[in-house]
From Swiss-Prot:
Interacts with YTHDC2; binds transcripts that regulate the mitotic cell cycle inhibiting progression into metaphase, thereby allowing meiotic prophase to proceed normally. Interacts with RBM46. This is Meiosis-specific coiled-coil domain-containing protein MEIOC. Is required for meiosis completion in both male and female germ cells. Confers stability to numerous meiotic mRNAs in gonads allowing proper initiation and progression into meiosis prophase I. The function may involve YTHDC2 and is independent of induction by retinoic acid (RA). Maintains an extended meiotic prophase I by properly promoting the transition from a mitotic to a meiotic cell cycle program by binding transcripts through its interaction with YTHDC2 that regulate the mitotic cell cycle. Pfam families: MEIOC. InterPro entries: MEIOC. Residues 949-965 have a biased composition (Polar residues). One of its GO terms (cellular component) is nucleus. Expressed specifically in fetal ovary and postnatal and adult testes (at protein level). In adult testis expressed in spermatocytes, beginning in preleptotene and extending through most stages of meiotic prophase I, including leptotene, zygotene, and pachytene. It is found in: Cytoplasm; Nucleus. Keywords: Cytoplasm, Meiosis, Nucleus. It comes from Mus musculus. It comes from the Eukaryota. The gene is Meioc.
Length: 965
């Protein structure tokens, strides 16, 4: 409840001088404190319960205790009613507000709880001073409660709001620092700690009372520390508390392909890598009689590829594909939490199944889910049962089987959905024909490429057509087979590959435009002028210098340049096919050799959310698909692969739901040495090469298959963001671009890395921001107070200048060091100014004012001590190799101390305002206050201009400062 405008009891003061508390009466202060002492010391959940009661009291309109005492978020609370139901609990009765008996920071080893008699003496002293200075009743009501100011769950920012990009990983209304006894050193811990911090970080549902009093006296100090940091290990600013309840893990990951096999999973599966190595591939090859020889590191290749063996090849690769496809990141987001439940979920992820083989070899497809934007089916040969028996761990992420929705007759009519493994041409297709479907998983052309390509190898290119359909269903499409799945293929774009004089044509097909989908006209056609002057020049250069691009293997055996035919198909696809490409957003290159021991995601999952490779295109635009180049005869093999990578390797993007927001998460992409568009320049920047996407597709995880475990070259590894910043000041801007101009492309096209922080580090930065806000507000209010006193006491020198020694900053200070020095300086100035006020009013100020300032100084000393401990312990651990958990404990202790300093700074602001109201003469006119406000505003504006000029003149220091805490 806000203060009514007709209130005339409060003293006049400048507008905006104090945004904090202003009391009206203090008659009930003693009655309030008796119950408040039992309530304000509660920890997290109890405080949350209190805040809920507070909100209900405000809505019911009960009589306020503080009519003029406005908190920073302009709320007022009736505390007389809220404390009644909670104080009846016997377990809360023994809890005493530790802030009332604040012990010096140097004596934390002693028991800080004092007998209740001291509380009575403090009340008697306050009552005596109230009788002496009874003319200012409202001020004494405020001053009397300064030391007992509640620790509400409200932000301590000066404006009452917190920055949107700052997320706290633990509540703002946690118990005080003196309650965190586990953070203190061993000899300084009190014996009777009564609150366990397990409730802060445990993900289990326990009642509030049980959370508060789960303390076990038999726990060792190290176990208590582990409780404090449970849940902090995998947190950062972007992903917090994304774990599911433990009951969902067994539902999400059930091994149903083999009823006798049950897999064991991590408690939080998306943090840990659940992939298991393929241990049985070599055994399968030995059983099939294939001669093998060593190929690179941890790879096996065959000496010859016979046509009957292609069935085995497809079987092994499909088992790879099924396994890692089913191991997608389902548990990262709550809407994907129950993939095998029967109810339809609009945001549910695609359901992966084991494809059954019908009588004539036609694969069976899963049922379409309502509004599911991707569905997959895999062609699984009948003899893969042997593969399942040999390698059961590859099928440990299977999902339940569903009924087919496409009939055998319908399927047989479409050549695009058939699988040709070289056994026979059932539907009139050649064994080496790449048949495009509506997705990017099809047309995977396997090519064998050695460390130095052997031009004499007649089987340089072998194609294995792996077909898996990715269907898109919008809101209006029924569960039956949509009409846009009737694809007509045309053999109208032959692209010859030159292989030592022998040409093997892989026919690329253009799918006909959709007519049945209700969204078929909503998406513009893809620009077909992908290869224009720049790309033609690149081709010419590649023809003239074939050796310039064929030697950049970097000991990866050419695996980075293995591309599938769908990259060339991606250059020629029109509207609908590229719509599906933007839906599936996955590119798969088959691993080098069909018996690769790595996962398919290591070489093929390319999801580059790169703002430099994506340009938004209005939906009304259309392009003429007649300008596609027909032939690439003159390109050598390696050069052709490089061109494919340059044109189609990094063109995947993501679009948000509704507003076309591109996901800003940076993905690790495979650096294809110097052949990709990062090092050679993107040929599509000004060529109108756009990806198309729908506004209706929800945003998915950017890492569906996890990070690659192969140590591929990356821009993070090639050029570190901080390594060269001191030697070359403009190196980072040239390599990564400037964050302030996100639309401009950096010189070398590298994406600026995003630094992630742990939970305690994130909390430290949040508390720093809060405390800086309070410090700035205290500084402004101190200057405003000086102006008010100078205006109302002409001829008197009012200044906060003092000779108090302030420690100097180190040569390379962090933000914590700067904050400590600033707080010490401001606290000394406030103390000096309060001494001037006492001389001006010829009487001492309230005792709580000086006590609050003393506690402010103590909180600063605590932060200083925690900072020293962090530095010393970090240096010791660096020499001894202690685990990082100890480092996190120091950071957490520092963040807690800064939080307490923030509270003390806010109370110092309250005391400063109270002292000013007690000091100002009662004859101060409104006109004089207006003049003072104007003068103060001019002073503040002048100082802000000076700060802006200083900050703009030294941008590099600002950038370097953000990397520290």
């Amino acid at each position: 409840m806000e203060v009514s405008g007709g209130d005339t009891c409060r003293p006049r003061h400048p507008q905006g001088l104090r945004e904090g508390p202003e009391p009206k009466v203090a008659a009930a202060a003693a009655a309030f404190r008796g119950s408040a002492n039992r309530c304000w010391n509660l920890s997290v959940d109890t405080s949350n319960r209190l805040s809920d009661v507070f909100n209900s009291m405000m809505l019911t309109g009960s009589a306020p205790f503080y009519d003029c005492y406005k908190s920073q978020n302009e709320d007022n609370v009736d505390l007389r009613q809220t404390c009644t139901p909670l104080s009846s609990s016997t377990e809360y009765a023994s809890s005493i507000d530790s802030s009332l008996f604040y012990a010096p920071w140097s004596t934390y080893g002693d028991d800080i709880k004092q007998p209740p008699s001291s509380q009575i003496s403090v009340k008697n002293r306050i009552q005596t001073e109230r009788n002496d200075y009874g003319s200012e009743t409202d001020l004494y009501g405020l001053v009397s409660n300064i030391l007992e100011e509640q620790d509400k769950s409200q932000p301590y920012f000066a404006e009452g709001t917190c920055s949107s990009n700052l997320k706290s990983v633990w509540p703002m209304n946690t118990s005080r620092f003196v309650d965190h006894h586990d953070l203190l050193t061993e000899p300084k811990r009190p014996v009777d700690t009564s609150i366990s911090q397990q409730a802060f970080y445990s993900g289990e549902s326990v009642s509030a009372v049980e959370k508060q009093y789960l303390h076990n006296s038999s726990l060792t100090p190290q176990q208590k520390i582990d409780e404090l940091y449970h849940g902090y290990t995998g947190l950062d600013l972007e992903e917090q508390w994304l774990y599911l309840s433990r009951s969902d893990h067994s539902n999400c990951y059930n091994s149903q392909a083999n009823d006798t096999v049950k897999a064991t999973f991590q408690e939080y599966p998306f943090v840990k890598n659940c992939f298991t190595p393929q241990t049985g591939l070599s055994d399968i090859m030995k059983e099939s009689g294939i001669d093998t020889y060593a190929y690179g590191r941890e790879k096996i290749c065959t000496k010859g590829l016979e046509t009957p063996l292609q069935h085995k090849r497809a079987e092994i690769f499909l088992s790879q594909f099924n396994r890692y496809n089913e191991n997608a990141d389902y548990c990262r987001y709550p809407e994907y939490a129950h993939p095998n439940k029967a109810k339809l979920n609009k945001c549910s992820n695609f359901s992966v199944q084991d494809g059954k083989k019908l009588a004539n070899g036609t694969p069976e497809t899963p049922t379409v889910e309502a509004d599911a934007y991707t569905k997959l089916f895999q062609v699984k040969p009948a003899n893969q049962k042997k593969m399942e028996e040999t390698i059961p761990d590859q099928q440990n992420f299977a999902f339940p089987k569903t009924t087919p929705h496409l009939t055998e007759k319908q399927f047989a009519k479409e050549a695009a959905f058939t699988a040709d493994f070289g056994l026979k041409s059932e539907y009139g297709l050649k064994p080496h024909t790449a048949c495009p479907t509506n997705n990017d998983f099809a047309n995977v052309s396997e090519k064998q490429q050695f460390a130095k390509p052997d031009p004499l190898n007649s089987e340089y290119f072998k194609s294995v057509n792996l077909f898996s359909n990715s269907a898109t269903s919008s809101g209006g499409i029924s569960l039956n087979r949509p009409t846009w799945m009737n694809v007509q293929t045309k053999n109208n774009l032959p692209i010859p590959y030159r292989n030592q004089g022998n040409l093997m044509k892989l026919n690329s097909h253009l799918s006909a435009a959709s007519k049945g989908s209700n969204h078929s006209s909503d998406f513009p056609q893809l620009s077909s002028t992908n290869l224009t002057s720049n790309s033609n020049l690149f081709q010419k250069y590649c023809q003239e210098n074939p050796s310039a691009f064929s030697s950049f293997d970097f000991s990866y055996n050419g695996a980075e340049r293995i591309q599938s035919v769908n990259h060339m198909e991606g250059l020629t696809k029109t509207g609908e096919d590229n719509l599906f490409e933007s839906v599936t957003e996955k590119k798969i290159k088959q691993p080098n050799g069909f018996c690769d021991s790595y996962s398919a995601s290591q070489y093929g999952i390319i999801e580059n959310v790169n703002k430099h490779n994506f340009q938004a295109k209005p939906q009304s635009g259309h392009y003429d698909p007649e300008d596609i180049p027909k032939h690439f005869d003159g390109l050598p093999q390696n050069t052709y692969q490089d061109l494919l990578e340059s044109q189609g390797h990094f063109n995947s993007h993501r679009q948000g739901s509704g507003d076309n927001n591109i996901n800003s998460r940076v993905n690790r992409t495979q650096a294809s040495c110097f052949s990709n568009n990062y090092m050679m320049g993107d040929l599509r920047h000004n060529q109108g090469f756009q990806q198309l996407g729908s506004n209706g597709f929800p945003l998915r995880s950017t890492h569906p298959f996890g990070h690659s475990v192969v140590p591929l070259l990356d821009s993070y590894d090639l050029f570190s963001y901080d390594d060269l910043s001191h030697l070359y000041p403009y190196f980072n801007d040239m390599m990564y671009g400037d964050n302030s101009f996100s639309g401009f492309v950096p010189t070398f096209g590298f994406q600026r890395p995003i630094k992630t922080r742990s939970g305690p580090a994130s909390e430290l930065h949040i508390r720093l921001e809060e405390c800086y806000e309070q410090w700035r507000a205290l500084e402004k209010e101190r200057k405003k107070t000086e102006l008010a006193l100078a205006k109302n006491y002409p001829g008197k020198k009012v200044s906060s200048t003092n000779n108090t020694p302030i420690p100097r900053l180190t040569s390379n200070p962090s933000r914590v060091d700067r904050l400590i020095v600033d707080e010490l300086r401001e606290q000394a100035r406030v103390v000096t100014l309060l001494g001037k006020m006492e001389r001006l009013r010829s009487s001492p100020l309230h005792a709580n004012i000086s006590t609050a300032l003393d506690r402010h100084l103590e909180s600063i000393h605590i932060v200083q001590s925690r900072r020293k401990d962090e530095i010393v312990n970090a240096s010791n651990r660096q020499r001894q190799g202690v685990p990082r958990c100890q480092d996190d404990r120091d950071v957490f202790a520092l963040a807690t101390a800064i939080k307490e300093m923030c509270v003390a700074t806010r109370k110092a602001r309250t005391t400063l305002w109270c002292a000013l109201q007690m000091t100002l003469p009662k004859t101060a006119s409104t006109a004089g206050q207006a003049d003072m406000e104007k003068a103060f505003q001019d002073l503040v504006n002048c100082e802000e201009k000076v700060h802006e000029s200083i900050n703009s003149s030294n941008p590099m220091n600002q950038r370097g400062e953000t990397s520290k805490h």
